[in-house]
From Swiss-Prot:
GO terms for biological process: ent-kaurene oxidation to kaurenoic acid; gibberellin biosynthetic process. The keyword Transport does not apply. It holds the Pfam family p450. It is found in: Membrane. Its main location: membrane. Expressed in leaf blades. The lineage of its organism: Eukaryota, Viridiplantae, Streptophyta, Embryophyta, Tracheophyta. GO terms for cellular component: chloroplast outer membrane. This is Ent-kaurene oxidase-like 3. The chain crosses the membrane at residues 3-23. Heme binds at C448. It is a single-pass membrane protein. It comes from Oryza sativa subsp. japonica. CDD domains: CYP77_89 (cd11075).
Amino acid sequence: MESLLAAGAGGIGVAAAAVGGFIAAATLAVAPPKNRRNPPPAVPGLPIIGNLHQLKEKKPHQTFTKWAEIYGPIYTIRTGASSVVVLNSTEVAKEAMVAKFSSISTRKLSKALTVLSHDKSMVATSDSGDFHKMGKRYIMLSMLGTSAQKQFRDTRDMIINNMLSTFHQLVKDDPHAPLIFRDVFKDELFRLSMIQSLGEDVSSVYVDEFGRDISKEEIYNATVTDMMMCAIEVDWRDFFPYLSWVPNKSFETRVFTTESRRTAVMRALIKQQKERIVRGEARTCYLDFLLAENTLTDEQLMMLVWEALIEAADTTLVTTEWAMYELAKNPDKQERLYQEIREVCGDEAVTEEHLPWLPYLNAVFQETLRRHSPVPLIPPRFVNEDTMLAGYDVPAGTEMVINLYGCNMNKKEWESPEEWAPERFAGGRFKVADMYKTMAFGAGRRVCAGSLQATHIACAAIARFVQEFGWRLREGDEEKVDTVQLTAYKLHPLHVHLTPRGRM
């Protein structure tokens, strides 16, 4: 999904050459129905390809936001044969996700995501129905719900303490060298994910298909990094489904090879843990819970465990890295947060119990979610039945995309949205409702299951990091705010100089 038009634009020439006899069919596929009385404004495009050529910069969320300034918060574009309604307003997006949920609840997946998710065999990609309800109930009961979070409290504390110890050691080894924040944070988040999902921090595993043991780094690459990159692969046939018979071997080879590696590694990890269970070594983890339920096929079991494994490995890292970048860039705001921590905690280390009493910390977290939306675009959905959004008629069969980046950069809803200003969220104690102002965790019945854990980890980590160290950007990094294509990942990993505060 991420490189929405690198591959799409690259395949346009091939598609155009092949569609000569299909122009009429394409026109019919995108023609608005006659009874559509008040459609959203349409962004002008070209025959056959629609607006694909205008999205070639690979950051469609930014292009969508620019179009919103011209056409308004809701408008229609065409991506090949598909008509897509784009929402760029918090108010309209919440109307779609909450009030009109029953009309707009079917996931629209690219061919790459269809393969990687084993045709929606995950909570995040499944349509609303029995499987989605079951999967969400399982992960909330055993891993991400309030009660389950209490069971993993010690593990969350451990990974934050590990990060702080690593920071102290790196500063001690070379006080003048900047450290790479992402490397340290990534390793500890993956440790947490493995303990929660598999019951232990796996250092290596034997994979039958590879004929050898693979390291933890290789496990991470096969289950997280490679999958994230493969998920953004675009098959030009997604835009021209009437040409699905045309081969695209290079795309298919990349996607199926990546999926096969992920499956081989996940099967090896699950096999290793099943052997542990046979030895009588039961543990509190997601895999043990799912096996005890005994309601899933082997494929469903593998996919749900994999989903749990990557749960904390992406958005929590993105948000925390951006928060520390902004605090290092803005020493006055960093000092305000530090003083708040001192007033509330004194010399005591910040804990999760302190979080409700740290309103400026909450403001830092919320403003980071707004300014640097971890998921700039919510994956497309189908409109199941004729409906109305923001006073416009939207017919069944239309695709809908919510541009969270555009919602949070909407000048009519946010003052000076390009500025990172935690003060816009400051005031009073932290409230659970604050988590949904930016819609970073979604809204309505499809709200992100991991929102509570993400908040616990990110807020506690940010507070401890500022409590222990003064943060300063590497010289020249003040304006490095570019992201990796569609994701919110910093294109340039955060390099910082740390100064121990001598608290402990």
